[in-house]
Amino acid sequence: ISKNLWDISSEEMMKYTRMILEKQHPALENVDQPMFVYVLTMREHGPYELGMENTFNLQMPNLGAKSISALNDYTQRIVALNDAIEGMNNYLHERKKPFVLGYFGDHQVAFDNVVPPKKGDYAQPDYVTQFVVRSNCASQFKQEQCFLDLAFSGGILMNVAGLSADDEFMKANMAMCKLSNGKLEDSSNPAFVNDYRHYLYQTLKIAK
């Protein structure tokens, strides 16, 4: 890919994802095990258009005209992303093969250094985003948390897929998710979180 990542549409990224799943590269021809594909889209990221019309009729007292324009641009990009995700979800269902599709946003958006106020009682509201999982697997998974640190997202995907952890790191990660009600950075028990990190880095030595 020779394009700047910021210029590649989310739909184009989904096209490349389908090519991977269909093993359209020689290096994938003999792969006969389940594949994990991580896709990063950047088209939703700034910079945003500052001269766009207020197509979505957006109003917010603390945002100026340029920020409203940027918010319209951001919104149309999110609409395009949603269409791309829905298309991928339909594609995965039509393949009639087991799949787990998870997607999330990595941070909140800001316009002209103005961060819109967030709803909800969160310790770090500017870092709260969404995490969605879809699947056609006959899973016994039940959502137990109303909040989830993205550090635990891998374990959730495994649970939905009906997979158990084979290594000590994932066993600890999945156990911590349950014991801490899905919280890590937002936990009200920092000593417990520090014990978890000590176990990961000092006992398991997951990083050097």
PLM-predicted stretches and their roles:
Residues 1-208:
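Solvent-exposed soluble domains appended to multi-pass membrane proteins
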